[in-house]
């Protein structure tokens, strides 16, 4: 974390000076499913039936303050008006994800793993895709096989394709696969592929 301190400080300063609101954005996500099959499914405060433990994810704020509360839209779209100009740059280079290192140190996430979803999205995808909860057998990650192969996608076909990559990662998970994903993450970040 110390190696990232200068970058974290610079990004935090730019976010703070560019628009009103907090520097860090916190949001509930669905994490590792720690159940052994004997306990009921965990839910969050809204009563959603989740296949994993909810946790708070941290990111640099890339949207105007309160944009999430004013909109019913859950997934971001290309040219989303809720995103600040600085936020577009942060998202393009995935710099908004850096605070998730805190989640890694807390044990909520790994560096590599399936992308953690918001409870509402998780509940919807679990209804649509039978195998979706299988992703929760491991901790979610900052980057993952689906992210480097597919980027960001919200269409049903893209979501299903990403699920197949997540399940492949869950079944083949190893040190060497993690290294391969990390190496493939570098060009994704540098070429701004998959950012919204």
Task: Locate the predicted segments by residue.
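The feature captures the short pre-catalytic strand/loop hairpin that immediately precedes
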Residues: 73-82, 157-161
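Solvent-exposed coil/turn segments that connect beta secondary-structure elements
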Residues: 65, 116, 151-153
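A hydrophobic, helix-centered structural microdomain
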Residues: 1-66, 175, 180-196
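C-terminal terminal-structure detector
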Residues: 129-196
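Residue-level recognition of specific faces of alpha-helices
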Residues: 13, 59, 82-85, 100, ...
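A short, polar/charged loop-to-alpha-helix boundary motif
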Residues: 65-74
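A short, structured surface patch at a secondary-structure boundary
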Residues: 1, 76-139, 181-189
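Positions in alpha-helical segments
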Residues: 12, 25, 84-88, 165
């Amino acid at each position: 974390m110390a190696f990232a301190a200068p970058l974290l400080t610079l990004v935090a300063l730019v976010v703070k000076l560019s628009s009103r609101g907090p520097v860090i954005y916190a949001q509930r996500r669905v994490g590792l499913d720690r159940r052994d099959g004997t306990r009921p499914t965990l839910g969050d405060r809204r009563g959603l039936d989740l296949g994993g433990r909810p946790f708070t994810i941290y990111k640099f704020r890339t949207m105007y303050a309160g944009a999430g509360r004013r909109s019913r839209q859950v997934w971001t779209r290309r040219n989303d008006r809720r995103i600040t100009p600085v936020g577009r740059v942060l998202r393009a280079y995935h710099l908004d994800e850096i605070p998730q290192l805190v989640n890694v140190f807390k044990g909520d996430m790994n560096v590599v793993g399936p992308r953690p979803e918001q409870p509402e999205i998780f509940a919807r995808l679990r209804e649509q895709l039978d195998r979706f909860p299988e992703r929760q057998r491991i901790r979610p990650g900052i980057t993952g096989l689906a992210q480097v192969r597919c980027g960001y996608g919200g269409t049903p076909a893209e979501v299903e394709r990403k699920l197949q990559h997540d399940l492949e990662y869950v079944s083949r998970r190893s040190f060497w696969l993690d290294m391969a994903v990390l190496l493939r993450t570098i060009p994704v970040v540098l070429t701004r592929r998959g950012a919204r």
